[in-house]
Amino acid sequence: MKALEEELFSKFQLSAQQYNALRLLRSVYPASMQTLALGKLLISRSPDTTRMLDRLEQRQLIMRERRSENRRVVEIAVTTSGLDLLDEMASDVQAMHRRQLGHLNRTELRDLTALLKRIREPHEDASCVWLDE
């Protein structure tokens, strides 16, 4: 499964972590999200979140802004270029998911999702919106 992800994301010069960050930022668009909040939501919590965001910013897929009242707080927002890239990737991402999980029926997929949520729930901040889906 990981090989399929790497194959897809490398086609767009992204890592799975970068894709996930863009996807999470799109979920709050047009608003922004603080770096710390994004870090808590990422599936794989990497210590080099700043470098990952640097790479996305260099490609103009995100923009960062420091709050004037507290310069330590950095707000991140996806740009229109980032949104365009996610749109461009959408059909390929769906095809990848079909290759990864297409052998499961609807009930099995629902059960898998429920189990994954249950596994992750004790480790999540109560504010995680995906737990309520």
Spans of model-derived segments:
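Flexible interhelical turns and helix-capping residues at alpha-helix boundaries
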Residues: 1, 42, 46, 90-93, ...
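Hydrophobic recognition helices of helix-based DNA-binding modules
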Residues: 1-4, 89, 119, 123
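N-terminal helix-turn-helix DNA-binding core of bacterial DNA-binding proteins
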Residues: 4-45, 128-131
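A short hydrophobic/aromatic micro-motif that marks alpha-helical segments and, especially, helix-coil
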Residues: 30-32, 94, 120-123
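Charged, amphipathic alpha-helical coiled-coil/dimerization segments
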Residues: 54-117
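C-terminal regulatory/oligomerization modules of transcriptional regulators
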Residues: 107-133
